[in-house]
Amino acid sequence: MSGLVRLGVILTDRGSKYAVSGAAVASRAEIDSVLNDLKSDKTYAKATHNTWAATLPTGALKADDGESGAGMVILRMIERAELQNHVIIVTRWYGGKKLGGDRFRRVQDATRAYLDHIGVQS
């Protein structure tokens, strides 16, 4: 078990649904374990994008999973909040309409919801 916290679907925009999850991690192997745990749920495995970012003692990591630039949005928010040894995953199920730049605002909204949930100032 990875200690994964799932907030589920927290917002929708023009048919797209966004969820946010996260966990404390100390290594890339633990990030992979958290991602595998999340994707063991078929709903998340079938998502259009599972973008994520993490801070580790060895440095920061991120992945866009096809949602270009989204990992960096999450990473900037994690770094601004000074959250260490943590991964945050923003999941999107595409709703059929392109969101343009609003997709980054939705990623920010989801990340902020997670940070608020764990009691970290964003």
Question: What are the language-model segments listed below?
Answer:
Residues M1-S68, I78, D116-V120:
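C-terminal regulatory domains involved in ligand/effector binding and gene-expression control
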Residues G22, H86, K98:
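Functionally constrained cores in energy, signaling, and assembly domains
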Residues A54, N85-Y94:
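Glycine- and acidic-rich phosphate- and metal-coordinating loops
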Residues G69-G71, V90-S122:
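Active-site-proximal loop/helix of nucleotide/amide-processing enzymes and allied scaffolds
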Residues M77-L83:
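Short glycine/proline-enriched loop/turn "hinge" motifs that connect secondary-structure elements
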